[in-house]
Design a protein with these regions (language model features):
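Terminal cytosolic tails of multi-pass membrane transporters
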Residues: 1-4, 381-403, 424-528
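Hydrophobic transmembrane alpha-helices that form the core helical bundles
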Residues: 29-33, 41, 50-137, 141-145, ...
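Helix-loop-helix connectors at the membrane interface of multi-pass transporters/channels
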Residues: 74, 101-131, 165, 222-226, ...
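Membrane-interface loop-to-helix entry segments
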Residues: 108, 128-178, 211, 234-238, ...
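Transmembrane helix-loop boundary segments of multi-pass membrane transporters
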Residues: 28-39, 100-103, 112-126, 149-158, ...
Length: 528
């Protein structure tokens, strides 16, 4: 594999993937759900996701290949679990450019009439808006077609811009339009309690904005010495973006006018709210900043969508490791780019643009599907320590078993907070994906040896999440007592976590697969 990325470039990619449309909309929707207490949601989410990221730091340095994410569940639980988790990961990555494109469209609706319709803070594209979104999605394909080196050079320039503009926005709004009374009036600091904070994390775009750290793991095979740099890149990018988003939330809450809050934070409304920060800048008389933010409203989500388009193509091209897929998916052009996978992902993104509506709805759904796919990381960390105890680990996580369980619990509550509306879609897509996978395996006569027994834990997990979500307090029936639902989810997570570890494949299976894989990649690191 060509080593075309430096560690610094990968750090830029990680930051870029977490500073996209989330910074343009996350503060608005988080304040809508939690009021001023939304400022707590960002550092809390960053801390919770750190437990998940630490699990991937150890795993990533064990298997520093770009296709390692696709292989983890195959190593630990066999083919069926790997098919499910890898398909969900790929699906989530493939449609992430859709929400970044939606960010571009919603901001643009303030100066291009007729591309969106909306009711309150909920938006959907018109036919013209949909056609514009297709143009943006196609441009991702064209840019990525010319290779990872070009991608890195473009992305580095984007990242510098994406750090400067949000920082300038925070300083300008606090300096020119700051109302400290906003934090304690209109219902107080926590008008909707802790439930509002938890809703803000999943449905308000907080978790979604910070979930991009895993792009590092997917692309780490493109850099030299991943064992040295991956943990630092993961922790550093997560810390930086958490601080940046917290500052943005602070400036947003403090700069909203009294007139916009007459009906409370849940009914927050002001002129031009489709582009919230640009609108606040204009209302404060900073037209120059408003214009700059409209420019950034294209650059930030566009560059993030470019990152996701790249990583999703790499993910799809490596899925033949876990399920028999058409060989054409792995076909690369002279720039070593899986161009067929880019095209397939474009078709999926174009389809999902018709199914999902508006940035807020998209972010909640993506949190649900990504958190489920992230849950395999903490489980794999514990399983692989039992299956491959002597395998070389350039970074070994201290207290790994406890941190892994906390990370798994974070994934569980993240799905629950996303709400029943999102979990219901997740369930439908998972079932459809399983049916299609089984049909394909039967057609190719590869359905034997699917390791169905080792996948039962995931069926229990998905069914349990659906039940909790249906009876829960986030779009469900509100039957579960508030806060007791989190305790029940803790016990449920402990049960599933233990079941998943007990369901792991024998060590001989794991050693054989890893040996075969690293031999193929020329990186045989098994200790004798």
């Amino acid at each position: 594999m060509n080593k075309n990325l430096s560690a610094l470039s990968l750090l830029w990619i990680s930051i870029t993937s977490m500073v996209g449309s989330g910074w343009l909309f996350g503060s608005l929707y988080s304040a809508h759900f939690a009021g001023p207490a939304a400022i707590i949601a960002w550092p809390l989410a960053g801390l919770l996701l750190l437990f998940v990221a630490l699990s991937y730091a150890e795993l990533g340095t064990m298997f520093p290949q770009s296709d390692s994410l696709a292989c983890l569940p195959l190593y630990t639980h066999g083919r069926l679990t790997s098919v499910i988790m890898s398909s969900m990961t790929w699906f989530g990555l493939a449609i992430l450019p859709v929400i970044e494109t939606q960010g571009v469209i919603q901001y643009a609706s303030n100066y291009i009439p007729g591309i969106v319709t909306h009711f309150g803070v909920y938006y959907r594209n018109t036919p013209l808006g949909y056609m514009l979104s297709l143009v943006v999605l196609m441009s991702f394909v064209l840019l990525n077609y010319f290779g990872i080196g070009l991608f890195a050079r473009i992305n580095a320039a984007f990242t510098v811009w994406k750090i400067i503009i949000p920082t300038l926005t925070v300083v300008s709004l606090i300096t020119m339009s700051y109302h400290p009374e906003n934090f304690f009036q209109y219902g107080g600091f926590m008008p909707y309690g802790w439930q509002g904070i938890m809703a803000a994390m999943s449905s308000g775009g907080v978790l979604f904005s910070l979930l991009g750290f895993r792009q590092v793991i997917i692309m780490m095979g493109e850099i030299k010495k991943p064992g040295k740099y991956i943990p630092l890149i993961l922790a550093g990018s997560l810390l930086f973006t958490t601080l940046l988003y917290t500052g943005l939330q602070w400036s947003f809450i403090g700069s909203v006018s009294e007139q916009a809050l007459t009906k409370g934070w849940v009914n927050l409304s002001f002129t031009g709210e489709a582009g919230p920060f640009a609108a606040l800048a204009a209302l404060a008389g900073m037209v120059w900043l408003s214009v700059l933010l409209y420019v950034d409203a294209f650059i930030s989500p566009y560059s993030t969508g470019l990152v996701y388009s790249t990583t999703a193509a790499h993910m799809l091209s490596s899925m033949d490791l876990v399920i028999q897929t058409p060989q054409v998916f792995a076909k690369r052009n002279k720039y070593q780019v899986p161009w067929v996978s880019l095209g397939v992902n474009f078709l999926l993104a174009a389809t999902m643009s018709l199914v999902l509506h508006g940035w807020q709805e998209m972010s909640a759904f993506l949190v649900a599907i990504l958190m489920v796919s992230y849950s395999i990381g903490p489980i794999a960390l514990v399983c692989l320590r039992k299956q491959l105890p002597n395998y070389q680990r350039p970074f070994r996580l201290q207290g790994g078993n406890l941190i892994a369980f906390i990370g798994f619990y974070v994934c569980t509550v993240g799905v629950y907070w996303a709400g029943f509306h999102s979990v219901r879609k997740l369930l439908v897509i998972t079932v459809l994906g399983l049916v299609c996978s089984f049909l394909y395996c039967f057609i190719k006569n590869t359905h034997r040896g699917l390791d169905s027994k080792q996948a039962l834990w995931f069926i229990v997990y998905l069914f349990g999440l659906s039940v909790f979500s249906y009876f829960g307090n986030y779009g469900g029936k509100h039957i579960l007592p508030q806060y007791w639902d989190l305790l029940a989810l803790l016990l449920f997570s402990l049960f599933v976590f233990g079941l998943a570890i007990l369901s792991r494949k024998p060590s001989t299976h794991t050693r054989r697969l890893v040996a075969e894989h690293v031999q193929q990649t020329g990186k045989n690191e098994l200790t004798k």
